[in-house]
């Protein structure tokens, strides 16, 4: 009897595991879609999201950690990140601190790009408020890029709102990144 149940359980397990052969396709990829930015509330909430992104950078101490690695001001804490005190050069994208800064900056840059790009399409808001929100989004975008270039020099420059995952990137020369940040566009 035990052998029957064991065989039946194994057979059912195999059927359940092999029953789903479709790949999961996430639609939409983010709640920040063009339709979201096209509304007055979405326009303001997009800017709020960009501001909230600064908390994810500074609040987790990732930026602080990256600026003092290799100095005598930073010691291994309870998290056991021994690479910091051993002066190892193991800081690449597989390191959580590095990956988190990179991801957060580009996520927030894309949010700022959405606010900037879809501002002209917003109706029902005074031009003065739209202009102020766009100026704030441009400042935040420039700040996120400034953080990126301080750590990595040449970085990918995204000037438009990305609605789908991007699987390739080209590094933009540092001088061009700075010129873009200083321009009014």
Which ranges hold each PLM region?
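Short clusters of hydrophobic/aromatic residues that line enzyme substrate/ligand-binding pockets
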Residues: 24, 36-37, 69, 84-91, ...
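Outer-membrane beta-barrel and related beta-rich outer-membrane complex signature
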Residues: 62-69, 154-158
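Conserved, well-structured interaction surfaces
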Residues: 39-40, 44-48, 52-56, 79-152, ...
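Membrane-proximal, proline-rich intrinsically disordered regions
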Residues: 20-67
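Core domains of carbohydrate- and sulfate-ester-processing enzymes
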Residues: 71-77
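Short, well-structured active-site flanking segments
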Residues: 24, 149-160
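Short linear capping/connector segments at secondary-structure termini
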Residues: 29-33, 89-92, 159-166
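Bacterial Sec-dependent N-terminal signal peptides
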Residues: 1-32
């Amino acid at each position: 009897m035990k052998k029957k149940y064991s065989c039946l359980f194994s057979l059912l397990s195999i059927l359940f595991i092999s029953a789903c052969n479709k790949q999961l396709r996430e639609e939409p990829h983010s709640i920040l879609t063009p339709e979201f930015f096209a509304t007055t509330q979405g326009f303001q909430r997009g800017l709020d999201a960009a501001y909230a992104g600064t908390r994810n950078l500074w609040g987790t101490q990732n930026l602080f950690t990256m600026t003092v690695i290799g100095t005598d001001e930073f010691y291994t804490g309870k998290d056991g990140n021994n690479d910091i005190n051993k002066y190892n050069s193991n800081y690449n994208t597989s390191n959580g601190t590095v990956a988190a800064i990179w991801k957060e900056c580009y996520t927030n840059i894309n949010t700022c790009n959405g606010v900037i790009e879809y501002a002209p399409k917003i109706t029902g808001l005074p031009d003065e408020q739209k202009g102020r929100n766009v100026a704030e989004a441009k400042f935040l975008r420039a700040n996120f890029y400034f953080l990126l270039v301080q750590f990595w020099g040449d970085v990918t420059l995204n000037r438009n709102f990305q609605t789908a995952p991007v699987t390739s990137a080209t590094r933009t020369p540092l001088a061009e990144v700075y010129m873009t940040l200083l321009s009014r566009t």
